[in-house]
Amino acid sequence: LLRNDAPDLVISGINRGPNLGGACIYSGTVNAAMEASMAGRPALAASLRSFTSSDYSVAAEITLRVAEWALKNPLPRGALYNLNVPDLPMDRILGVRGAQKLAPMFLSDARYESFQSEYKHTFYFLTDGENPHAFPEDSDDVLNERGWATVSALSWDISLRQGMPPIDVKL
């Protein structure tokens, strides 16, 4: 499609609802950006932390500013930037901050929350429940909850680096 005129940056989103922490694994928005990055294109996934807001103007403005920054600060092939914008007016957003840690997803505490679209479709989302104390203070979820637009660098490589026991399987 774009063989001779590839984009300088692929922006996936703006997603309705956050893509923070372990939820990134399930996100079509994040994974569309991941596909672009694996094809060698710089990519940015953008999400608004609201399932009900219809005003994307603040998220769009912040996405544009982060996109301009991302073009000047490229990541290696196979990596992407993941932006999450709080659902706040611009004058209440504290700024844009890098989040080195993704909030963990504790499936033992998880629950499903439902959301009904304007077309009366019901969607279910796996959430971490009501346990923000379990998240590190500098994690994407905590920073975003406090009013920061957060940017995380993600990679497709989710391999466990340490802790896998030696394979001893007889055939």
Region spans (language model):
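Glycine/threonine-rich flexible loop motifs
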Residues: P18-S27
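Glycine-rich phosphate-binding loop signature in dinucleotide/nucleotide-binding domains
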Residues: L1-P7
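Glycine-rich phosphate/pyrophosphate-binding loops
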Residues: S37-A59
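Electrostatically charged, flexible surface regions
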Residues: V58-L171
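A short, flexible beta-alpha/helix-coil linker loop
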Residues: R16-N19, S50-F51
